Each structure stands twice: as structure tokens, then as C-alpha cells.
């Protein structure tokens, strides 16, 4: 009983931290738009400045009285940018400026964003230790057993050694977000051993906003069974 209780408490603390992060005024729910920058300078209602850009470089011209982070009036070149980009604060929000394969973007986050105020919660399946699986990392794939069968999921190695997995399963589009969910696994040990905790399967940002750009699961990362663990489809109120 003590072990189950400790497991449930740890999961609950993780879930509450996850919800707090989603509700943050600099989080995914706070995004008010995504702007793809082109050669012609444009001004947008939800972020200061006149914007243009190409490839991995953005250009912003700020008028008198406008500022972004430490940038004041004048023309500023931001780049070369990567996918993480930079974040520049302004009165009432934050401007994320980043590179994408289609060119640079500016993506404002504002405390008054409609999605942030409409968000209710992300329901979950009950935490269940039975959805924790021993696994091994072999040739770019996480290998584990479920109901007597072996399954493999392609994984990417993060900078800190942990494994990032995008997957679909029989709940996708039914009780969980249709496109995919994600998992972050502990870094494998010297013999490749790790662990999958499906209770911590989370939604990608595109489950919360139309202004996110998300990858898709690799071919073969659709599990043939229902993973009744982790996050379900987010709930929003009608405003």
C-alpha cells in the first residue's frame, strides 16, 4: 500500500506541476498568434514593431515609445535564429522569435490570450503502476513488452541523455489527442536499460493551440493496443 501511495503522490505532484505550467502566462495557452515573416515589413496588433525576415533572420523596426526586451526604437536584426529562438518581453506579453523550415516566425504570448482564459483542464487516466514498463534502448528504438508481445518505438536522444518518444495508440482520436502523445524516458544505463511510464504520457503543444508547429510520430510508432494512461484530450470552455 505504501508503494502505491508513494507512486500516486509522485504522479499527482507531477500532474499539478504540469497543469501549472500550462496555465502560465508565458506558456502555450498564452499564444495569441503565429506570424510567418516575409520580405515586406508588416505590423501586427498583438506585438510591438514592424516585422520582416527570411531564412533564419528576423528584422524588427520599433517606433518611438516601443520596446522589446532591451531593444528600443530603431531597426534591429535578430539572427541567425534556431528553433528555440529568443524571447523578448513587452508590456502585456512576450514575443517569441524563432526559425522554422518555412522561415522565421514571431509568436506573441499574452496574459489576455483567449485560449488561456478558455482552458479548463487536461483530464487524465487514473495513475496506475501497471502502466510502468521495463524497457531497453537498442539501435534508436525503445523495446518493451506488453501482454506477452514485444513492441518497439523509435526514440530521439535528448542533450541530457533522456529519450523522447512520439507515439499513437488505439485511444488516439477517441479519448486522447488524435495526432500523438509524447513520452520522456530516463537516460538508459550502460546496458541500455530504461523505463517507460505511460502514466506520464503528455499532449504536444498542438493539442492546446493552433499556433504551434508539431512533428508527427515516426512510421511504426503506432501501438496496436489502447494505452489507457496519461493525458486525455484537453477541455476548453466556450467563451
Regions found by a protein language model. Give the residues of each.
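Extended, aromatic/histidine-rich regions of cofactor-dependent oxidoreductases associated
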Residues: 193, 201-239
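Broad, structure-driven detector of short, well-ordered beta-strand segments within folded domains
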Residues: 48-54, 93-99, 151-155
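N-terminal beta-hairpin/loop module of FHA
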Residues: 15, 19-48
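Forkhead-associated
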Residues: 37-82, 185
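Actinobacteria-biased recognition of intrinsically disordered, low-complexity terminal regions
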Residues: 1-9, 16, 239
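Acidic/His-leaning functional-site neighborhoods
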Residues: 145-189, 199
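Surface-exposed beta-loop interaction hotspot
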Residues: 89-145
